[in-house]
């Protein structure tokens, strides 16, 4: 259950500052590093980082990139785009060390290292199944289904874990003996998957964020599906309509009443804690522009922040 949350109603969808990675050219300047967020003694999520003057460009595998502007002298500090996440770094003889931390959570801090060099994602020679139907073992006897989905981008292994409420966004990986590893870091969500594959069966482990962990097992099944989201969410039988008064981004109150709408309307429940809300926001913004006023889109943002200004 979320505590101390604030609801923000916004008519327009925000655009986000993640982008496709730009290929480096021979004329590129600055320094390249292998960045690592250390989840525990034996697990780290690594990624490429480029430092150009006071700007760090993080590369989430081969699928997206984002920038963090640094300030300070002895201790460099920066804020990640979109999400309530910051970092600090100090220079050492062979790179930088510091912390990644969330500003909307107490004591959510993980060691962050930048070591000179660069990661190379080798092409994956094996043909893994495109989809595995897995069972996640979440502890205390709790088991939940998911789909581990794999693909190749320019020959490099990419994937995600999809559940009935979303997925783990973009992960990039490589083969290891007997299976594969996937990693992803987008400024907020930190994932590592280690899997062993034998014929059509799979088993493995997932580390998420600072303390998240579960094991899984499953079988290859390209036709497997999850619970229909339209059956998961519906208006309660004792409610006749949807109505709210909420503050908009400009501070004015926005009143919505489903009984008065005159065009197709999308209500998007979102927040910076949601892995897929950024991707959904891009899609909804595209829809809104393409239909040129023929639809309405409302973003209802729930945040952990203690104040409206911070949210």
Language-model segments: which ranges?
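Central antiparallel beta-sheet cores of small beta-barrel/beta-sandwich binding domains
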Residues: 27-92, 123-197
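Short active-site neighborhood of thiol/selenol oxidoreductases, capturing the structured segment around
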Residues: 254-279, 284, 297-298
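Structural microenvironment flanking redox-active thiols in thiol-disulfide oxidoreductases
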Residues: 279-311
